[in-house]
């Protein structure tokens, strides 16, 4: 085994006089040099605390503005405080966090992943479509987003984004995914608070969830069962919407749910 431990205070490749109080802390444990890591920070008080294990992990992190955070845990496999922990191989993460205002509400991305071949692309301050098309940022992006991932298993894919264009409005996404071969897309955007709690714990689900527009929408989704579920949920409009699903699919052909609320 080998260990790589380093800590950088201030922005990478920029002078301390221009940007201060950025911090990067990375612990790598493994037997291979195939880890790829690309980090860009621009602004004040951005923090990347990260730990790795095993081979072929690819992580790209871009943080702009101020008060962004990615995630960290000091104990393998514990998910301590649901902070960052990659303990597997062939994981791919692409994380962007963005704020273009003088004062940012803070974007957070906390994760604990234990397994192989996970692909997590999550954008805060941006909009991304289900086909991975990345749109331009809002002209007024004040941050205030939060997501916590806990992915155990292999070959999961997770794509999503959170953004708003007014200060004081926050989005949150708490996710637990323990099964394999799930295809998940989640997008929250627009003014007013949006919240989503997703728990899957089985395999081969196809999930698309969008919450948008200028109202406070919330969704709680719990899936499980012997067979997969195809879920499409859209909540929109200026009236607050709420949706909760607990699904235990026992149909050998799979289950399908499609819900649209608001106009």
What are these regions (language model features)?
Residues 4, 16, 260-263:
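Extracellular/surface-exposed low-complexity segments
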Residues 1-2, 22:
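N-terminal hydrophobic targeting signals that begin at the initiator methionine
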Residues 21-263:
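Low-complexity repeat regions of mature extracellularly deployed or surface/particle-associated proteins
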Residues 2-13:
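Sec-dependent signal peptide recognition
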Residues 14-20:
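Sec/Tat signal peptide C-region and signal peptidase I cleavage site
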């Amino acid at each position: 085994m080998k260990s790589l431990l380093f800590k950088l205070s201030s922005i990478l490749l920029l002078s301390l006089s221009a940007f201060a109080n950025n911090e990067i802390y990375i612990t790598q444990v493994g037997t291979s040099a195939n880890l790829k890591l690309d980090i860009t920070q621009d602004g004040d008080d951005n923090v990347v605390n990260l730990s790795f294990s095993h081979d072929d992990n690819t992580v790209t992190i871009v943080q702009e503005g101020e008060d962004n955070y990615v995630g960290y845990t000091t104990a393998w496999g514990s998910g301590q405080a649901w902070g960052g922990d990659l303990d597997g191989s062939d994981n791919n993460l692409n994380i962007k966090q963005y704020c273009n205002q003088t004062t940012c509400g803070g974007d957070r991305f906390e994760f604990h992943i234990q397994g192989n071949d996970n692909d997590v692309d999550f954008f805060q301050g941006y909009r991304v479509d289900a086909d991975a098309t990345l749109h331009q940022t809002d002209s007024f992006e004040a941050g205030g987003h939060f997501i916590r991932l806990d992915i155990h298993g292999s070959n999961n894919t997770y794509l999503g984004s959170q953004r708003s264009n007014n200060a004081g409005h926050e989005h949150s996404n708490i996710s637990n995914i323990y099964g394999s071969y799930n295809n998940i897309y989640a997008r929250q955007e627009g003014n007013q608070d949006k919240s989503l709690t997703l728990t899957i714990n089985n395999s081969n689900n196809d999930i698309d969830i969008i919450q948008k527009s200028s109202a406070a929408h919330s969704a709680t989704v719990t899936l499980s069962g012997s067979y997969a579920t195809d879920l499409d949920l859209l909540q929109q409009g200026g009236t607050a919407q709420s949706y909760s699903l607990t699904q235990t699919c026992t149909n050998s052909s799979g289950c399908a749910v499609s819900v649209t609320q608001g106009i």
